[in-house]
Regions:
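Fe(II)/2-oxoglutarate oxygenase catalytic core
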Residues: 13-14, 18-261, 265-293
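Leucine-biased recognition of intrinsically disordered, low-complexity hydrophobic segments
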Residues: 3-4, 15
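Generic N-terminal simple sequence motifs
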Residues: 1-2, 197
Length: 293
């Protein structure tokens, strides 16, 4: 079956047994009718995979009771799974991270714009996050489309950035004074003051769709290759500001049982920390990717 492209669709449309509703005009869609617990047919998986490529962020509603093994089985249909180098996974499922904020904690994990694992030589393809316990309000996740941000650049700036590379490292976030290293109350995270640095293109071509997008982020992009941090800061900040403009974003309002998947090759995300006094418990699988080009 040939799937419709987003430009051919309205705000809501039916594909076989799945119903897909767009979350914004730029990116994001929620999907009803998928059963990750019972398992997906090849046809249903193909629909979900296409929606993932089309919308970059997909929310699979109604997956209450999804087990760790079932979550891993779904994620593995996209690729092999990553074991986080700085955050301890579950004892029986090291590929899965439990992201927990207890009612008495003030700092959350992922509370700033970033792309998962861009500090690796082969950054993550995508992340699959399951909502186990959600607060009565707040705790939403924002997403920002880096291909849309690239499309808004002038031709002159696109030409300037083409061929440039940036240095990515975990030391900004997981260093001794880094934000993520401070989140050690309900999560076992270690510091990485001597984390390696890897060089990635500033403009990345998506390996499956061929679309170009920015591939830098505030958490892990340290500087442009061959530039000092001071020299890099003005241009990086301009690109960061453009990337997170509201017109490039969508918002996921979590419901218990949701499974949200996003494409780290072209999307940033930001977990909002506006639910103090309430518990939030998520479980994440991260899918290995390839070397950016």
């Amino acid at each position: 079956m040939t799937l419709l492209r987003p430009a051919q669709r309205g705000a809501s449309f039916q594909l076989m047994t799945l119903t897909i509703h767009r979350l914004s005009g730029t990116l994001g869609a929620e999907i009803h009718g998928a059963d990750l617990i019972g398992g997906l047919s090849n046809a249903a998986f193909d629909e979900i995979h296409q929606a993932f490529l089309d919308h970059k962020v997909i929310v699979l509603r109604g997956q209450n009771g999804l087990s760790p093994d079932q979550q891993k089985a779904f994620a593995r249909r996209f690729g092999t799974l990553n074991i986080h180098p700085y955050v301890k996974g579950m004892d029986d499922h090291p590929e899965l991270m439990e992201i927990i904020k207890e009612p008495d904690e003030k700092t959350n994990f992922g509370g700033g714009w970033h792309s998962d694992m861009s500090f690796l030589e082969e950054p993550a393809l995508g992340s699959v996050l399951h909502a186990i316990d959600v607060p009565p309000y707040g705790g939403d996740t924002l997403f920002a489309d880096q291909q849309a941000a690239y499309d808004r650049l002038s031709d002159g700036l696109k030409k300037t950035l083409e061929g440039m590379t940036a240095i990515h490292t975990a030391s900004k976030e997981y260093g001794a004074d880094g934000y993520s290293a401070a989140v050690r109350q309900s999560m076992d995270a270690k510091s990485a003051p001597d984390a390696p640095e890897y060089e990635h293109p500033v403009i990345r071509t998506h390996p499956e769709t061929g679309r170009k997008g920015l591939f830098i982020n505030p958490a892990f992009a340290l500087r442009f290759a061959g530039w000092s941090r001071k020299e890099s800061r003005p241009l990086l900040n301009y690109l960061f500001d453009l990337s997170r403009e509201e017109r490039n974003t969508c918002r996921v309002r979590w419901q218990e049982g949701d499974v949200t998947m996003w494409d780290n090759r072209c999307v940033w995300h930001y977990a909002l920390n506006d639910y103090h006094g309430h518990r939030r418990h998520m479980r994440r699988a991260t899918i290995n990717g390839d070397k950016p080009r």
